Amino acid sequence: MPPELLRDVLMRIERSEDTWPSRKNVVSCVGVCKNWRQIFKEIVNVPEVSSKFTFPISLKQPGPGGSLVQCYVKRNRSNQTFYLYLGGEAKIFCQSEPSEPNKSIWKLSLKPGGTATTQTELDNFVSFRSPSGQKEGVLVLKSKVPRLEEQSWCLDFNGWRDIVSSGKKFQLVALLRTNLRMKTTFSSLRKSETCTNSSYEAEWIPLVRTSVFAVIARVCRDKKHTPSYELKLALYFAKNSAILKKFVLRGYTREEDLLALPVAN
């Protein structure tokens, strides 16, 4: 095909059907020689200017914000994997994180008041409609590992959950040492939502291995008891404790009442 005829065909396609996603016709062409590639570079603009013709590398950049793309995300509970379906048909499944340049290439190319520089040649481009056996350059979505808050037994998902100090929940941490110890960190017992400061001070309490799991299982299974009962239960299971150097309760229950509890059998 002569270069003049190719230029005329591309310009006609460029002028027709300029709206997404209502456009239905998709044209795919490849510049197999140097002259054809030069014509493509002259006619095809960056995605900010033209949305009809684009290069494969431009597909990795974010799309326009004015239109919607139909998609569906499915979660696999067995291995905590997420599958992305585009248009209800195309399935994207990934098993490794993308390389760092691919994640930030569009951010580095954008400048205030200008347009993005678009790469016109791509060495190896694999369509997502026919996934190959290679595992490079794919993305994995997994649940973020929660962490326990210091003052209460609340999960912190960095924005996914609100952290509020709770008087009915506390944190138990067991250390795998010769002398198995459990650290109890209590939060405020008041019902006021404005009170978030810790109202307890506790030191290390020596516990046996079975007692640690007994306290955790009992508190997790039954949430109907008051905070005072849970606190007494924690001390009740603390058998074989030779020393309780310091256990201060402020404004709720007297220290003498808790230390007078019998030792578990």
From Swiss-Prot:
GO process annotations (BP): regulation of DNA-templated transcription
Occurrences of domain F-box (ranges): 1-44
Gene Ontology molecular functions: DNA-binding transcription factor activity
UniProt-listed SUPFAM superfamilies: Tubby C-terminal domain-like
Coiled-coil zones: none
Residues in FBD domain copies: 228-250
Domain of life, per lineage: Eukaryota
The family this protein is said to belong to: Belongs to the TUB family.
PANTHER family (alphabetical): TUBBY-LIKE F-BOX PROTEIN 3, TUBBY-RELATED
Protein name: Putative Tubby-like protein 4
Organism: Arabidopsis thaliana (Mouse-ear cress)
Gene: TULP4
